Regions:
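Internal catalytic domains of large membrane-associated glycosyltransferases
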Residues: 1-261
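Basic/Trp-rich segment in TM-proximal cytosolic loops or flexible interdomain/linker regions
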Residues: 164, 220-224, 230-426, 438-459
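Long, low-complexity, polyampholytic intrinsically disordered regions
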Residues: 432, 446, 464-466
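Final/C-terminal transmembrane alpha-helix of multipass membrane proteins
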Residues: 454-472
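A short beta-strand->alpha-helix segment at the C-terminal rim
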Residues: 474-477
Length: 477
C-alpha cells in the first residue's frame, strides 16, 4: 500500500493532471456536495486576481460556505455563523481569511512555490515536481500541453495523466512538503493557507448577498461530532508541529494574523476548561465545598460581570449578523457538546499521532441525506443515533449536573448555604438548561432519535465511578 495523504494528496494529483490538460492559471476548488449558485462568482474572484494594483498579492479568493438545507432552527450550528459572518470578515481586514477547503479560487503559481522562475533549469525542476516532461513544460510555458495541440494522440495524453496520478509519483519530490497542498495535517487547507500567507501571499474574502456556492450542511449529531473531531485533530496537529503559528518563521505575515492562526490551533483545547467547569464545581457542591465567593461577598460581582459580558458579547455578534436568541442557545449548546467530545478526542488523536501511538486517519463527513434524520432536524429535534464514544460523556455529565443541582437545592433548603454555593448551583442549572434536549432524549422522547437505555445505564455507571473515585481520593487525603 502507498500513503495517499488524504484530501491533500487527492488535490495535488488533480493539480498535476490539470497542469498538462488545461494549465489554467486559476483553480476553483469545491467539495463534492457544493455547486455554483451564482454564475458571476468566478468573475468576482478573477477581478481580485487581475486587479492592476493588488493582483500580485492575493493567493486565493475565499467565498463563504453556505448550505441549501439549513433549517430555520439551526440546532447543529450547521451554518458555521461564527466563522463566515464574524471571524472571516475580521481577518479580511488583516492579511485575509484562512483557506477553508472549498469555495475558493486560487492561483496555480501560488501552489507551485518559488521554484518556478524565468529561465529555470528543467532538470532542477524535476527534483521538486517529479519526472514528467510534459508537466515541466507546463510550468515553463504557462500554456496547454503539446499533447492537446494535436501533436500527439489522445492515448498519450491519457498515459501522461495516469503517470501523474500514480501512487508513487510524488516520491522523492517536494509535493506535499513545499509544493501543492501540504501533507502534515488532516486540516490541509488551514495549513496550506498558513504556509502561503507566511510567504507573503494575501487572501480576499467575498461574501455577497446572493450565495455564490451552496452545499449540504450536517443534519445529525453523529456527522457534527465526527466532523468536529477531524477538524480538531487537524488544528492541533498544526499547533504541535513545526508550523506552530506562534513559533514558525521567518514569516511575512502580520503579527495579528499570526495570533489569529495561533488562536485557531488552540481552539480544541477548550475541552480542558469545559471538562473542569462541568465536573469540579459539581463534585465540590456534592461535598459541600464552596469554590467561589458567596453572593454577599464583594468579589461575587466580578464573576457575575465576567459571565454576563461573555454572553452579551456573543449575543451582540449574533444579532449583528442576523441571528436571534435561539441562535445563541444553539451555538452555546453545540460549543459545549463539541468541547466535551470532539475537541477532546481530536486533541488526544493528534498527540497520539505525534507520539507514534497510532497512524493518521481521515473521517469524511457523510454527504448523503437520510429522510428520517432530515425530518427530525427540520422539526428541531436532535438525532442521538451516534456512537457510545460521543454519547456517554454527554449523558454522564448531564446526570452529574442533575445530581449536584438537586443536592444544591437540598442544601439551600435544609442548611441554608445557598449564599456560599450559589455560583456552583447556577453553573449546574445553566449547563442543564442549555443541554435540556439531552434530558429530553433520555426521559421524554420515544422516537428512534432518542438516547438508548443502554447508553443511559452505561453513563450512570460512568458517573458513579467518577463519584466513587473522588470520594476515595478525598478519604485518602
Amino acid at each position: 500500500s502507498y500513503p495517499h495523504h488524504f484530501k491533500a494528496g487527492a488535490v495535488n494529483t488533480l493539480l498535476r493532471v490539470s497542469g498538462v490538460i488545461s494549465n489554467s492559471p486559476y483553480i476553483l476548488s469545491l467539495d463534492c456536495d457544493m455547486y455554483c449558485n451564482d454564475p458571476t462568482s468566478m468573475r468576482q474572484a478573477i477581478c481580485f486576481h487581475l486587479d492592476p494594483i493588488t493582483s500580485s498579492s492575493p493567493a486565493f479568493v475565499q467565498f463563504p460556505q453556505k448550505f441549501h438545507n439549513i433549517a430555520k432552527k439551526d440546532i447543529y450550528d450547521s451554518g458555521i455563523r461564527s466563522a463566515f459572518s464574524s471571524m472571516w470578515p475580521g481577518l479580511d481586514g488583516l492579511d485575509g481569511p484562512f483557506l477553508t477547503g472549498t469555495c475558493f479560487v486560487i492561483k496555480r503559481v501560488a501552489l507551485y512555490g518559488s521554484f518556478v522562475q524565468e529561465g529555470a533549469d528543467p532538470m532542477e525542476l524535476k527534483k521538486y515536481f517529479g519526472p514528467s516532461n510534459e508537466f515541466i513544460k507546463s510550468l515553463l510555458q504557462h500554456a496547454k500541453s503539446n499533447l492537446i495541440h494535436g501533436k500527439d494522440s489522445f492515448n498519450e495524453l491519457l498515459q501522461e495523466a495516469e503517470f501523474l496520478a500514480s501512487c508513487t509519483y510524488g516520491d522523492q519530490t517536494k509535493w506535499g512538503e513545499e509544493v501543492g497542498f501540504l501533507h502534515y495535517s488532516v486540516a490541509e487547507d488551514f495549513l496550506t493557507g498558513f504556509a502561503l500567507q507566511s510567504k507573503g501571499w494575501k487572501s480576499v474574502y467575498v461574501n455577497s448577498s446572493k450565495p455564490q456556492f451552496l452545499g449540504s450542511g450536517v443534519t445529525n449529531l453523529n456527522d457534527l461530532l465526527t466532523q468536529g473531531t477531524r477538524w480538531s485533530t487537524g488544528l492541533v496537529e498544526v499547533g504541535i508541529s513545526k508550523f506552530c503559528p506562534f513559533a514558525y518563521g521567518p514569516s511575512k505575515m502580520c503579527f495579528l494574523e499570526k495570533m489569529c492562526y495561533g488562536n485557531f490551533t488552540l481552539f480544541p483545547f477548550y475541552c480542558l476548561p469545559l471538562w473542569c467547569f462541568a465536573t469540579i464545581p459539581q463534585l465540590c457542591l456534592l461535598k459541600g465545598i464552596p469554590l467561589y465567593p458567596g453572593v454577599s461577598n464583594s468579589y461575587f460581582i466580578i464573576f457575575m460581570l465576567l459571565f454576563i459580558s461573555s454572553i452579551a458579547q456573543h449575543f451582540y455578534e449574533i444579532l449583528t449578523t442576523g441571528g436571534s436568541l435561539g441562535s445563541l442557545i444553539y451555538e452555546q449548546r453545540v460549543w459545549m457538546m463539541k468541547s466535551i467530545t470532539s475537541h477532546l478526542y481530536g486533541t488526544m488523536d493528534a498527540f497520539m499521532k505525534r507520539l507514534g501511538v497510532r497512524e493518521a486517519s481521515f473521517l469524511p463527513t457523510n454527504k448523503a441525506e437520510d429522510d428520517e434524520r432530515v425530518k427530525l432536524y427540520e422539526n428541531g429535534a436532535y438525532d442521538f443515533r451516534t456512537s457510545m464514544m460521543f454519547l456517554a460523556p454527554l449523558v454522564a455529565l448531564v446526570i452529574l449536573n442533575m445530581m449536584s443541582l438537586l443536592v444544591g437545592f437540598a442544601r439551600a433548603i435544609l442548611v441554608g448555604d445557598l449564599n456560599k454555593m450559589f455560583v456552583q448551583v447556577f453553573i449546574s442549572f445553566y449547563i442543564l438548561a442549555i443541554n435540556y434536549p439531552i434530558i429530553e432524549g433520555m426521559v421524554i422522547r420515544k422516537d428512534k432519535g432518542r438516547i438508548p437505555t443502554s447508553v443511559i445505564i452505561s453513563s450512570s455507571i460512568l458517573c458513579m465511578i467518577i463519584l466513587l473515585s473522588v470520594e476515595s481520593g478525598l478519604l485518602m487525603y
